[in-house]
Amino acid sequence: MGIKGPLLSGALGSAPTLAAVLRWTEGRSPVVVIGPPWLGDAVATAGRVLVLVEPEVRPVALRARRRAHKQSRALDVALAAAELPLGRATLPALVVENVGGLQDDEAARWLAALVPCLRPGGRLIAADATSSTAAAARVAGAFLSAALSEIVQEWPRDGALLTIGVAPTASIVAARFGAPTAVDELLPGEPRNFK
């Protein structure tokens, strides 16, 4: 039996869904997870993970980190708003939760802020707890608006949708999202605050 999330994690925490997430992140490290700590902990079974959480979730995330470290898993925790250490073109993979729960314009803005953090060819994986084909279409549209390519949608089980996209080349990122800042040019690949 594979890994699974906590009892009340629903379809996203099911063994088939987490196995699919691990398949899409395989060979990519570090992986940044913006979502619940248990999702970051599950992904950390296969490699180094940084989970970004809201301040109210930090105590739970720190407990997950301690458990992961006891089991020799590389899981780190940072606050999403204050400590977002994502530089431009630095991430091989990014897992986010609940893109389908956002309004269209919010989803487009959020993905437009995240895509430049991916390396060219890096993967963005959105995990959504939904059975709605309309929500799946909205997520795919948000991925298209963020210039992601090779978009795939997978339903590992009923009620769980994964949407996967590949980050564009640096020239497309510059054209779509603007040129790198002076800090990006001076310190390529170094973590820095993302605003």
Residue ranges of each PLM-predicted region?
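A generic alpha-to-beta junction signature in SAM-dependent methyltransferases
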Residues: 25, 44, 117-119
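Core SAM-dependent methyltransferase catalytic element
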Residues: 152-195
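A short acidic, Gly/Pro-enriched loop at the edge of an enzyme's catalytic core
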Residues: 83-96
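Conserved alpha-helix/loop element of class I SAM-dependent methyltransferases that forms part
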Residues: 3-30, 38-42
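A short glycine-rich, Lys/Arg-flanked "PGG" loop and its adjoining helix->strand segment in the class I
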Residues: 106-123
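Class I SAM-dependent methyltransferase SAM/SAH-binding core
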Residues: 36-82
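Conserved Class I S-adenosyl-L-methionine
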Residues: 131, 135-159
